[in-house]
């Protein structure tokens, strides 16, 4: 009887230990699986974070490069425009300076003669700057007295800095020899040339 009881006790212990071992193994397996999932998830999140960080860094780099390129273009455009403005100002100043009274005194009568060959004198008007008309009115009136007698008029325009305009009294047809118009003509040629020079220079930077 004692032997059977001992065997029963031993069996219970054995079964209990086996069950405990199996349970422990199950717990360990579950823990390992959970740990594996956590690690995989953490690694995936880490990789995603790295990708996002790299993409953001690349975006910032491209944005910075684009900003630098744009700043360079803006600087070149600003420099070119500033240079053209300076050159235009010089051209206009020099053109106005060279339209002195001696030049106008000879040029205006020749322009009137040329106009009269293609049209009448009655409707003709010669417009000068205020200062030039005051200085030249006497000599021009003498040189053009026949045309003035037929209706041609000499008058001043405060908008003209130098030179003159010749045309019909109503302004429907005219030739503009004002300092500004002549300067603009030179500038229209100069601007593309200057732009081309600056463009070629920029390629070498």
UniProtKB/Swiss-Prot annotation:
The source's superkingdom equals: Bacteria
> Care to name a GO molecular-function term for this sequence?
proton-transporting ATP synthase activity, rotational mechanism
Q: Which GO terms describe its biological process?
A: proton motive force-driven plasma membrane ATP synthesis
Keywords of the record, alphabetical order, are: ATP synthesis, Hydrogen ion transport, Ion transport, Transport
What InterPro entries does this protein's entry cite? ATPase_E_C, ATPase_V1_Esu
Listed as disulfide-bonded, the cysteine pairs are none
Query: What's this protein's function?
Result: Produces ATP from ADP in the presence of a proton gradient across the membrane.
| Similarity field | Belongs to the V-ATPase E subunit family.
* Descriptive protein name: V-type ATP synthase subunit E
User: Which gene does this sequence derive from?
Assistant: atpE
